[in-house]
């Protein structure tokens, strides 16, 4: 398997098209391991992976932990509520204390955008980004692309509509970076107060005035969660108004292609971003996204650790 040139995986912006394709290809191989009766290989035996989550997480933290264990790595989970961060310890000091434990990889989620680059300069071990502020969420972007590839067999030429709170979405940024590098056309829609200025500069991106315009003839419709916790003040009148103009329901979904897939990074606000009938409908690939998360994160850990795949 080809070598991966990076010590860290912090942003899809930092990776080439070929490197993203390599991570996706390896993830496809990792799925074979996940389908075995005994879901474990000795690839990262003897390696130590620290999961350092400064923000709450269920799917991402559990998925990274499961990925590490299936590759036979030792894992340590640290959360702010049980760490010295609650006593005022800085990220730099936390990093130096962790370094004394000699980890091979630190998987971190942090509320500050760019914090992983700071950590990478401080530490010789690999840093894997599990989400930083509103910057990027590379593992989510990769698993989303893998899920699209499962459905269509390709990414090149797909029309992907991303709808919702673009300004505060690290998921949107990672998807934009990855999808445009691999040849997809990305169409964005959301309330004007939730659309970052200059987003078109990120790649082959078109900003639309409405959900209906964005999802017209789309192959993929990706809905994003409204992130009130990242907003200094409310940026929408109320949930009912948001659902009226930017919520996905069975009627407006008909504007997309008949075989379009529906995605959401979770957690979902049913009845706001999407009607429950769409979440649970035949076009929903949301649970497949969760399933693909383990394989993608196995691929990321494997490549930064240069493991031997068996």
UniProtKB/Swiss-Prot annotation:
Single GO MF annotation: amino acid binding
PROSITE patterns linked to this entry: CARBAMOYLTRANSFERASE
Gene3D superfamilies: Aspartate/ornithine carbamoyltransferase
Annotated positions binding carbamoyl phosphate: 59-60, 109, 137, 140, 266-267
UniProt pathway: Pyrimidine metabolism; UMP biosynthesis via de novo pathway; (S)-dihydroorotate from bicarbonate: step 2/3
Gene Ontology biological-process entries: 'de novo' pyrimidine nucleobase biosynthetic process; 'de novo' UMP biosynthetic process; amino acid metabolic process
Binding locations of L-aspartate: 87, 170, 225
Gene Ontology CC: one annotated term: cytosol
Superkingdom of the source species: Bacteria
Keywords assigned by UniProt, alphabetized: Pyrimidine biosynthesis, Transferase
Signal peptide (UniProt feature, chain positions): none
Swiss-Prot/TrEMBL catalytic activity: carbamoyl phosphate + L-aspartate = N-carbamoyl-L-aspartate + phosphate + H(+)
EC number: 2.1.3.2
Function, as annotated: Catalyzes the condensation of carbamoyl phosphate and aspartate to form carbamoyl aspartate and inorganic phosphate, the committed step in the de novo pyrimidine nucleotide biosynthesis pathway.
Family the entry assigns: Belongs to the aspartate/ornithine carbamoyltransferase superfamily. ATCase family.
Quaternary structure note: Heterododecamer (2C3:3R2) of six catalytic PyrB chains organized as two trimers (C3), and six regulatory PyrI chains organized as three dimers (R2).
Protein name: Aspartate carbamoyltransferase catalytic subunit
Gene: pyrB
């Amino acid at each position: 398997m080809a070598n991966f040139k990076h010590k860290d995986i912090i942003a899809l912006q930092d990776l080439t098209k070929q490197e993203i394709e390599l991570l996706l290809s390896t993830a496809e191989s990792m799925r074979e391991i996940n389908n075995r009766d005994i879901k474990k290989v000795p690839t990262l035996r003897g390696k130590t992976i620290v999961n350092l989550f400064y923000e709450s997480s269920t799917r991402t933290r559990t998925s990274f932990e499961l990925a590490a264990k299936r590759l036979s790595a030792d894992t340590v989970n640290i959360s702010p509520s049980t760490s010295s961060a609650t006593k005022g310890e800085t990220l730099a000091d936390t990093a130096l204390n962790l370094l004394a434990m000699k980890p091979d990889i630190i998987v971190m989620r942090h509320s500050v955008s760019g914090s992983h680059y700071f950590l990478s300069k401080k530490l010789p071990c690999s840093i894997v980004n599990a989400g930083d502020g509103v910057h990027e969420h590379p593992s989510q972007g990769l698993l989303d692309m893998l899920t699209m590839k499962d459905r269509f067999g390709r990414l090149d030429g797909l029309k992907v509509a991303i709808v919702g709170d673009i300004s505060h979405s690290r998921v949107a940024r990672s998807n934009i970076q990855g999808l445009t590098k691999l040849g997809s056309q990305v169409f964005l829609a959301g309330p004007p107060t939730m659309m970052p200025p200059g987003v078109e500069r990120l790649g082959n991106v078109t900003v639309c005035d409405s959900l209906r315009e964005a999802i017209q003839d789309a192959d993929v419709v990706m809905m994003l969660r409204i992130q009130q916790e990242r907003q200094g003040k409310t940026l929408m009148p109320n949930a009912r108004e948001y659902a009226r103009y930017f919520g996905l329901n069975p009627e407006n979904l008909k504007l997309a292609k008949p075989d379009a897939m529906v995605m959401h990074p979770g957690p979902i606000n049913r009845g706001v971003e999407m009607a429950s009938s769409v979440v649970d409908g035949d076009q929903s690939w949301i649970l497949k996204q969760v399933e693909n998360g383990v394989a993608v994160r196995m691929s990321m850990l494997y490549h930064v650790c240069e493991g031997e795949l068996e």
